[in-house]
Swiss-Prot record:
Binding locations of Mg(2+): 232
Keyword list, A-Z: Glyoxylate bypass, Magnesium, Manganese, Metal-binding, NADP, Oxidoreductase, Tricarboxylic acid cycle
Note describing how the cofactor binds: Binds 1 Mg(2+) or Mn(2+) ion per subunit.
Catalyses which reaction(s): D-threo-isocitrate + NADP(+) = 2-oxoglutarate + CO2 + NADPH
Official protein name in the record: Isocitrate dehydrogenase [NADP]
Amino acid sequence: MAEFTPITIAYGDGIGPEIMEAVLYILRKAEARIRLETIEVGEKLYKKHYTSGISEESWESIQRTGIILKAPITTPQGGGYKSLNVTIRKTLQLFANIRPAVSLHPFTRTLHPNLNLTIIRENEEDLYAGIEYRQTHNMYESMKLISHTGCEKIIRYAFEYAVKNNRKKVMCLSKDNIMKFSDGVLHKVFNEIAKEYPQINNAHYIIDIGTARLATKPEIFDVIVTSNLYGDIISDVAAEISGSVGLAGSANIGQHYAMFEAVHGSAPDIAGKDIANPSGLLNAAIMMLVHIGQGDIATLIENAWKKTIEDGVHTADIYNEQSSSKKVGTKEFAEEVTKRLGQLPTKLPKADYPLIAEKQESNIDYKIDTKEVKKLVGTDIFVNMNVSSAHDIADKINKLDLGNFELKTISSKGLKLWPRDTRFETVSDHWCCRFMNKDGTEIKHLDITRLLEALSTANIDFIKVENLFEFDGVAGYSLAQGE
């Protein structure tokens, strides 16, 4: 008797329930060997004051099954609510987001008939961590966190993906000409790991020109690996230029769990109208079937879906009077796909997936390298002061007993404003005061607390402390513009 794989199903918000019903209908007709557990997440939970959008009972289901098929959810805009997508990815350590984009030319409109690429997006770090602060009346902060181990995991995954899927080239996109530490480590690790895969070509693009090339010459790309926010943006670009963002599915892969979802959002403006394209979620379900070792069902469904597209049976988002034969709604599209189960596409590439379940490599032990000698050499103390000039701040601070420190610079938004010509000023209430060790004196954490006490006594409102370190004598901090 065939073994049925337990799957957690989340219907989501907006168009989520109707496209999920369409996909489940196809899965049933294709006789997918799955057993469903349904959970409630998203907007309904937010309204019940679950700020994360998910309940403990839902987590228990996910822990039991290890696999989630999730329709889009609506995250309320503004403060007070965290993105459920990000919460699930981070909690389950789903470090890799795989987003294929393939042209269906000539059956859908696209300027790029040869587009066939996959974006591998880091899924746990970067600005997407959502660590934010309001520090003054005027200034807001969002932290960009990138780890060496996180870069190792996603870049190695990208090269392994290329090997397993007969891809020829992996390209890394970053902005390390500006963010030399956070984006710099991504590029550095990419270059190191690329040497282990001599059979795979590799290249690096700065994210801005890389995105421009992706939009105009996507055929030069094969596998793209990048950080979280960049990956989110460029995968939507790739999906849109392939024909429609409504076609793209994605997989979120970790060591022990996996989540599959459409790339697009919940589209509440068209919810309940039976016009949404279920193809994105269907393609996510196909990726799920491959992942759990049901390549036969994945092959059956994908070929039927492609035959439906070839026959010109299209939802409104890809319907074209010149090339489409029939405009259908969400439910009817699903019915048309099931009518073609067992049929093969004649022009689009035929699917043929293996029956072996995908497993993550478990023999790589990612450890934090602590060999470099770490030395405390200074501290950046951010202060909230409403003054017209950085020189006013310097005058006030330099009257204090700074102990083993000396005030080296004052900057705002990364621009050095003291010591500097007073003609160069800015409107700000958020200032970074850089204190360095005086005459090579050894600094201890107690020295910093004494410095903070001196600032507090002088009624200087300090709002953040960033200590400055050297690693094997190399500065682990950036300089301000003009420093």
